[in-house]
């Protein structure tokens, strides 16, 4: 099983962190937590409202608090928001308290998956492709830097990606326990 206290899913919006994460958590009998949902619960309002009235810095502060609290537990699968990686403290905590899986996706697949999504504050722009490309350029190196495992989810259904990730995680953890 996972040698780290938690399993942490990172990656851009639309990569499948929540949908795949729920399935993985169920398979490995982990408690599932989504940082965006936890932020909404803590703030008592939507992420869009937080961005609109309090700004992105306040959202990132709440995100840091929520992630810190979630990582203080064990046996959790934590699906993070796409921008969680931007904070150096978050990156450090995720590496220290989790096995980090980067769900990688290209911008064109993101556009397809997010075509009907009108709720993400960072996508409330006319040129979504440019926004996603800019976010990709900024965040991709950070995702790769802290990832213990990278899985590309382009052209995979959530079920296929889940099955592949279960195989990859099981093989990795068995290998880790055999060398320990």
Swiss-Prot record:
Listed GO biological process terms: amino acid biosynthetic process; aromatic amino acid family biosynthetic process; chorismate biosynthetic process
Cofactor note: Binds 1 Mg(2+) ion per subunit.
Record-level Gene Ontology MF annotations: ATP binding; magnesium ion binding; shikimate kinase activity
The keyword Metal-binding appears for this protein: yes
Key words of the record: Amino-acid biosynthesis, Aromatic amino acid biosynthesis, ATP-binding, Cytoplasm, Kinase, Magnesium, Metal-binding, Nucleotide-binding, Transferase
SUPFAM superfamilies: P-loop containing nucleoside triphosphate hydrolases (SSF52540)
Subunit and interaction comment: Monomer.
Function field: Catalyzes the specific phosphorylation of the 3-hydroxyl group of shikimic acid using ATP as a cosubstrate.
Cross-referenced PANTHER family: SHIKIMATE KINASE (PTHR21087), SHIKIMATE KINASE 1, CHLOROPLASTIC (PTHR21087:SF16)
Protein family: Belongs to the shikimate kinase family.
The protein's name: Shikimate kinase
Name of the gene encoding the protein in the UniProt record: aroK
